[in-house]
Amino acid sequence: MNPFEKLNLFLSSIRILKNWYIFPLVYFRLIKKPYVIFLTRDNLQIKIILDKSNYWFQVFVEQFLQEPYSENNFKIRDNPIIIDVGTNVGFFSLLMSKKYPNASIYSFEPNPDNYNFLIEHIKNNQQKNIHPYNYAVSSKNGKVTLYISIENFTGHSLYAKTENKIQVQSITLDTIFNDNKIEKCDMLKLDCEGAEYEILMNSDESLKKIENISLEYHDLNLQNFSLDDIIKKLKNF
């Protein structure tokens, strides 16, 4: 990151955070506590675990300051339905919950540890419009294997195989729509470490009801699908 980018980052932290003065201390790893709480100007409390990897801080910067899943170019109702697949610890869901207080947000996170932090964030911020589920989303309903990344709490995957793995419950996108009687989804956000391919390629009924999709695609599961497959698929809806 060049000096101009760093300056812009620090200025963004002042714009976003009430306790912005903590931000550079975390950036330069000058705080020797297990965690800090960032307080946003719209009154969100965001817990950041401080460890050697610094991944929590990096994800906070990405979600709150860089906003890769920004819906600014989308037309979204004041009372939208938003589905967050790969919620992690809830940063995106919290952002949308504050921005759209009348929204219904369905948040899916398969990793139990991340899910517990998601629940903590929801409770601490009293966000009653976030509906959390300790589920993976894939092309099947039932048990699936989730491979655990020891180094990166955002890297747990159905496809990036590691020695550490657990069985988790999975649900399809079509089942999510049917169970919750969703007739229109204003935004689907996908960050699911390779599962985005099988989700989108096997959800024809749901895709008809989705207005906007914001996704991160990964170089995983490429033996079965490619980014071109997703693009061709979505052009039909």
Which positions does each model-derived feature cover?
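Phosphate/nucleotide-binding beta-alpha loop and adjacent structural elements of enzyme active sites
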Residues: M1-F237
